[in-house]
């Protein structure tokens, strides 16, 4: 009597570089849409249609077609990225809210939320629809930033998180002041950098 032994292939300890890179690029598509809207001076809804929507569709397609031996790790990275993005966004917004609530600065960094919404809905920035759309886009950005980092750098030294935060901060400093209609100031830098630094301690698996 012959007993056949089935060998279970070992699970990969990391995703293929191409898979990680594509996942990260797709996750950053909402941020890329925002940057395109600002730089090209086009409505956010238009930039999102050509950048974010294809990126989201590609991410979903990657999720369901990733190689079987990578599926478990991919889903773990997906869950970790969503959690990291949520925690980082809460920390970022919480620090900004505290600084501005205590009147430590006169700048209102949250006005960007309504401008996001107005760019997506075409409605006035004071409407409830614009506010809801703006917060939704802000949350999507936060999730996307968390996902991109986890897919590329999960488990790496904390220096990677610092470098990633500095890159995001650099883009914000370059794009936001002119787009929001105020000049670069020490107050804006204080709020932005302090809030961004608070995201570096977010636990990432």
Protein language model regions, located:
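Transmembrane alpha-helices
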Residues: 9-71
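Aromatic-anchored segments of alpha-helical transmembrane domains
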Residues: 27-37, 89-94, 165-177
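Membrane-interface helix-boundary motifs at transmembrane edges
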Residues: 68-79, 151-157
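N-terminal signal-anchor transmembrane alpha helix
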Residues: 77-101
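Interfacial helix-loop-helix junctions of multi-pass membrane proteins
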Residues: 102, 174-204
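Membrane-interface interhelical connector segments
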Residues: 102-129
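Hydrophobic alpha-helical transmembrane segments
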Residues: 133-147
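Internal alpha-helical transmembrane segments of multi-pass membrane proteins
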Residues: 153-171
